[in-house]
Each structure stands twice: as structure tokens, then as C-alpha cells.
Amino acid sequence: MRIIAPMMMLLILLSPLSGCVGDDSSEELDTVDPIPDLTAPNQHGENVTLSEFRGTMLVILFNAADWCGICNDEANRTEELLQSMGGLDDRYTVSFVELLRDNAEGTTIASQEDAMNWSEYSNNSHSVLHGQATRDYIEETFDREDIPGFPSYLIVDLDGVARSWVVGINEPIVAEDVQVQYDAYLQDLDQN
């Protein structure tokens, strides 16, 4: 009986982390269809549509919120990551969008205020999308692609086709991941 109470307390304390992913996996995709589109407000209240980024290499960060410690860490490195992605290869332009699922406590859908606070806290310049449509998009995408949790990155090519997932933080996404997917995109164009 003495062990049950501490174990229950540990379970309760760790349950908010169940959506976070501590390991890493990367998967290249064999799809040829564009990703489903999403239109949702960003932290400034402006609607952003994912298909507007066609013609660029789009990196989408699927993120939770403050309750996910590794999500905080990832959000804090995105501006530097975006700069390194943009400066690596002049053959393409990189666009970056973050999809924020929850409020800081993980109890409700992320609002504009949550997205603005997240953006300011992380000192980011990219769009942070929020709201019911964003949460639905995250859940549908994770179900369809069997993605285990946050943070997760999706690299999308110039035609709007998903090229690769990078899930977790042990081997986080780097600028060269986008370059590799761009080269694979060019190779696929040559073969068709």
C-alpha cells in the first residue's frame, strides 16, 4: 500500500507530458498529393493559409504549449533555425509556420493571446497559428500520419507535398534537412 500513493502521485505529475516526445524519428514520405490546406489566424489575428507558401520549402512546426517543456525548448530555437535554413542554400526560399495546439496550461485551445504570448516569449518572427481549425488540423494530421506527439516538424516541398517528418528532439531538425528534401524534390522532378 505504501508504494501505491507515491506511484499514483508520479503518474499524476507525469500525465501532462504524455503528448511530448523525447525520442527522435525521421521519416521520408512517399506521397505525391499536396498536404491538406489550413486557413487559421496567426498571433496578430491575420488569416494565414498554408497553400500560400507553395513555391517555397515550407517547414511546419507542430507544437503544444508551455506545459510541454521540450516544446518550449524547440520554440526558443526556431528563429535561429529559420535563419540558418534561409541562409544555407540560395536555390530555394524557406517559409516557416508554427501550429500551436493548446493554451499555456494545456486545458483549452490556443487563443490569439496565447499565440502572441508564445511568439513574444520565444522571440519569433514567424506566424504562430492557433484556434479550433489549427487544433483540428493537428489532430487529423497526427492521426493520419501516426505521429506520436510534440514537437514535430513537417518539411513540405515547392508543390505543397509533404517530404519528411522530424519527430522529437534527440536529433533535432537542422537546416540541412530542408536542403536534403529540396534535392530529393529536384531528383523526383527529373525522374518524371
Could you describe each region identified by the protein language model?
Residues 34, 57, 148-150:
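Short, small/polar residue-rich loop motifs at catalytic or cofactor-binding pockets
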Residues 148-192:
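Thiol-/selenol-based redox modules, centered on thioredoxin-like
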Residues 56-57, 73-100:
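Conserved helix-turn-beta segment immediately C-terminal to the redox Cys motif
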Residues 58-62, 95-100, 127-131, 152-155, ...:
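Structural recognition of the beta-strand scaffold that forms the well-ordered cores
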Residues 1-29, 34:
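Secretory targeting signatures
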Residues 97, 112-150:
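Short, internal strand/loop/helix patches
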Residues 55, 62-80, 105-107:
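Conserved redox-active cysteine motifs that mediate thiol-disulfide chemistry
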